[in-house]
Amino acid sequence: MGPPPGAGVSCRGGCGFSRLLAWCFLLALSPQAPGSRGAEAVWTAYLNVSWRVPHTGVNRTVWELSEEGVYGQDSPLEPVAGVLVPPDGPGALNACNPHTNFTVPTVWGSTVQVSWLALIQRGGGCTFADKIHLAYERGASGAVIFNFPGTRNEVIPMSHPGAVDIVAIMIGNLKGTKILQSIQRGIQVTMVIEVGKKHGPWVNHYSIFFVSVSFFIITAATVGYFIFYSARRLRNARAQSRKQRQLKADAKKAIGRLQLRTLKQGDKEIGPDGDSCAVCIELYKPNDLVRILTCNHIFHKTCVDPWLLEHRTCPMCKCDILKALGIEVDVEDGSVSLQVPVSNEISNSASSHEEDNRSETASSGYASVQGTDEPPLEEHVQSTNESLQLVNHEANSVAVDVIPHVDNPTFEEDETPNQETAVREIKS
């Protein structure tokens, strides 16, 4: 029985996909001399088989051409032709006995042997190299080895290191059995072997299945990630779009609550000390329609309205008009609510008091310019003042008796009564 096909051509057994890729990469990088082939390459053989019945009055020849053979891995890539001759004896088809002989026909009317090819069956307990070497020693021009019974016309690239003197190919069992039966009936069979096509690495069914499954998994994972990523981007884009629409709607409401004013000759904005619009950098002129923001900065209406829709802040001081008008936007659901924060902690009351004072100053200043036509803003100022009174009441309800440390004892006696008086005032 011949050895299994070499691992250099087919990735069989425990060979993984990574090993197959490594072999293919090395095959692509390895330089090859003319007429040679890489370990992964497989060359087929074109077979021109003809049958002629000898010693008859009719010279009848039937031939067929097919690509049914495969060159051995160590075989020379050369064409060869000759009469097919099997080993002598019914049990010697494997040619594993070193004393196996071949009955070679001679040229008609002479004792000169014709060019012949040994027809040997695979198996018998010896290697391919043993069979090919025996045929070479008996004078064969080449060796044709046909496969096991039951393998039909399956072929493999043979590995026969050391037996490189003659051409060696493998053919299928059905093809070899047909030729052998014709020879046993006395029909002379001639075969012409020519070099066929070069094929890539031979991969077995398990490797093909593994590659297919891996490709499917990678493709499915890639498509799934792409769908997930696209859906996530679409969801974020929709949420951002809703947020922007809500903010623009709030900005429109806030802009509608801001005062408009038409400048007239004699206004301080037009005088020698007048300012220019910070958006268009142009001086104010009579009959210009300006927008007055909550921070008392004025701009051309046509200049500042588009800015407020996008940014909702003063172009100069970055004052948020939504917060100044008491509009708080919830980022999560985009809802609008009027919120006045009141802190119960003494540590936060001071900062809240300062912020509310600034807000009150800006609102009162804006109210002084706007006049009495904006009742919602006055209500907001009143609610803010009430909140400030609540915070101040909570801050005044707590007192701590602390006598600070005085570094100079000379003035300690004089300062103590004043400090005690200040503490009593805090308690009251």
From Swiss-Prot:
TM annotation in the entry: 208-228
Top-level EC class as recorded in UniProt: transferase
Metabolic or biological pathway, per its Swiss-Prot or TrEMBL entry: Protein modification; protein ubiquitination
Record's note on what induces expression: Induced under anergic conditions. Up-regulated during T-cell anergy induction following signaling through the T-cell antigen receptor. Upon viral infection.
Keywords: Cytoplasm, Cytoskeleton, Glycoprotein, Membrane, Metal-binding, Signal, Transferase, Transmembrane, Transmembrane helix, Ubl conjugation, Ubl conjugation pathway, Zinc, Zinc-finger
Glycosylation sites: 48, 59, 101
SMART domains: RING
Biased composition range(s): Polar residues: 360-371
UniProt PTM comment: Auto-ubiquitinated. Controls the development of T-cell clonal anergy by ubiquitination.
Membrane topology recorded in Swiss-Prot or TrEMBL: Single-pass membrane protein
Compartment(s): Cytoplasm; Endomembrane system; Cytoplasm, Cytoskeleton; Cytoplasm, Perinuclear region
Catalytic activity: S-ubiquitinyl-[E2 ubiquitin-conjugating enzyme]-L-cysteine + [acceptor protein]-L-lysine = [E2 ubiquitin-conjugating enzyme]-L-cysteine + N(6)-ubiquitinyl-[acceptor protein]-L-lysine
InterPro entries for the chain: PA_dom_sf (IPR046450), PA_domain (IPR003137), Znf_RING (IPR001841), Znf_RING/FYVE/PHD (IPR013083), ZNRF3_Arkadia_E3_ligases (IPR051073)
Region span, Disordered: 346-428
Domain PA, first and last residues per copy: 75-183
Stretches annotated zinc finger (RING-type): 277-318
Signal peptide: 1-38
GO annotation terms (biological process): negative regulation of cytokine production; positive regulation of protein catabolic process in the vacuole; protein localization to lysosome; protein ubiquitination; regulation of protein stability; ubiquitin-dependent protein catabolic process
EC number, as in UniProt: 2.3.2.27
Domain notes: Binding to E2 ubiquitin-conjugating enzyme requires an intact RING finger domain.
UniProt cross-references to PANTHER family, sorted A to Z: RING ZINC FINGER
Record's function text: E3 ubiquitin-protein ligase that catalyzes 'Lys-27', 'Lys-48'- or 'Lys-63'-linked polyubiquitin chains formation and plays a role in different biological processes such as modulation of immune response, cytoskeletal dynamics or protein homeostasis. Inhibits IL2 and IL4 transcription, thereby playing an important role in the induction of the anergic phenotype, a long-term stable state of T-lymphocyte unresponsiveness to antigenic stimulation associated with the blockade of interleukin production.
Record-given protein name: E3 ubiquitin-protein ligase RNF128
Natural source organism: Homo sapiens
Lineage, opening ranks: Eukaryota, Metazoa, Chordata, Craniata, Vertebrata
Gene: RNF128
